[in-house]
A protein has these predicted regions:
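A glycine- and Lys/Arg-enriched "phosphate-lid" helix/loop adjacent to the NTP-binding pocket
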Residues: 132, 242-308, 324, 331-333
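Hydrophobic anchor at the beta1->P-loop junction of P-loop NTPases
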Residues: 157
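Conserved lysine of the Walker
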Residues: 165
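Conserved substrate/cofactor phosphate-moiety recognition/catalytic segment
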Residues: 173-215, 316
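Conserved nucleotide-sensing/catalytic segment adjacent to the nucleotide-binding pocket
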Residues: 196-245
């Protein structure tokens, strides 16, 4: 039986890495990937490892949390790296070592394996992790959609009707040259309402379509995806209309609790726009309190945005400047 090995930080995991793994899968019976912890990217090791597991379920992924940081071609570094790799493999025999780096020579010899150097000149896949980290959006053609979506900061704006969500979301998207997700529930309601109401069954169809559109936009986004509401808002409207939401909407609202990196609540301190499709300022104030209570019950942290559009944009940008997708939110709110 033949067994291939490749290793690296995969920071992020890109088409060049995929070429290594796919070549190994085509040439050997089993494939092992050793993935290292690193500080060159904020994405945690287990997230990067799961990219590989999801894209290549047959591959064995070994997480190297305590791997050596050294990189180079000195005798000391070679010895340290070889000893660590052999330790992590714990006696697992490797017949082929796949890489596109200089270390393919000494690591393959230490393993007693065939040195399979793949696209060392980066002609087939002309990209590197360093290039990608400088601008994920510019290099997204070299990233699986599964990987790219985990690099986008997913921002949701909540609030009662006429709290400025749409204007703010659109303005931020234009400023950051990225995509924004309109409130699909509002679009659906305008098309399907009868006497200003839709059925509970119709509510069940809104969140799945909203999520489908949102995921499509996330694959096109540049650093941020700004979302005008999410399934939690649809859940709140269904509860307001019918007393209770349906099971699909309830589940998707629950999932939405963890699907966003940042939540902002637009305050009611701006003038109420009394259009035919709304139910008055008193209803706005009441619905806002219900949203706040629901967020508290769900234990979702959020930032309240107040003032005019310019003030709110600056409040959001002040948070975004300090925010790290895989960091601790409390660090920027302290």
């Amino acid at each position: 039986m033949t067994r291939g090995l490749t290793l690296g930080k995969f920071a992020p995991f890109h088409r060049g890495h995929q070429l290594l793994i796919e070549t190994a899968l085509a040439e050997t019976d089993e494939v092992v990937v050793l993935i290292y912890a690193t500080e060159v990217i904020e994405v945690p090791l287990q997230v990067r490892a799961n990219w590989i597991r999801q894209l290549y379920p047959s591959v064995t992924v070994i997480e190297a949390w305590d791997g050596p940081d050294s990189y180079g071609d000195t005798a000391e570094i070679r010895s340290e790296q070889e000893a660590y790799i052999l330790k992590k493999l714990n006696g697992l025999a490797i017949s082929h070592f796949y890489s596109s780096e200089f270390y393919g020579d000494h690591v393959s010899k230490a393993l007693g394996a065939v040195d399979r150097r793949i696209d060392e000149a980066r002609l087939q896949v002309p990209i590197s992790g360093t290039q990608l980290r400088a601008n994920y959006f510019a290099g997204k053609a070299y990233l699986s959609e599964l990987v790219y979506r985990d690099l986008i900061i997913h921002v949701c704006f909540l609030g009662a009707p006429s709290t400025g969500k749409t204007t703010l979301t659109r303005t931020l998207a234009e400023q950051h040259h990225t995509e924004w997700m309109p409130e699909y529930g509002a679009e659906f309601w305008l098309t399907h309402q009868v006497d200003r109401r839709i059925t509970l069954e119709q509510f069940e169809t809104i969140a799945p379509e909203h999520n489908r559109r949102e995921e499509k936009l996330r694959a096109q986004a540049n650093t941020y995806l700004f979302c005008d509401t999410n399934p939690i808002t649809t859940y709140m409207f269904a509860r307001d209309y019918h007393g209770t939401p349906g099971p699909i909407l309830t589940e998707l609202a629950k999932q939405a609790e963890r699907n966003y990196d940042l939540f902002f609540l637009c305050d009611t301190d701006i003038p109420y726009a009394d259009t035919w499709d709304r139910s008055g300022n008193q209803k706005r104030l009441c619905f806002q309190q219900q949203i706040i209570a629901d967020l508290a019950e769900r234990k979702i942290p959020y930032v309240v945005l107040s003032g005019d559009v310019e003030c709110r944009v600056e409040q959001v940008n002040a948070i975004l400047r300090r925010f790290k997708k895989y960091g601790n939110l409390l660090d920027i709110l302290a």
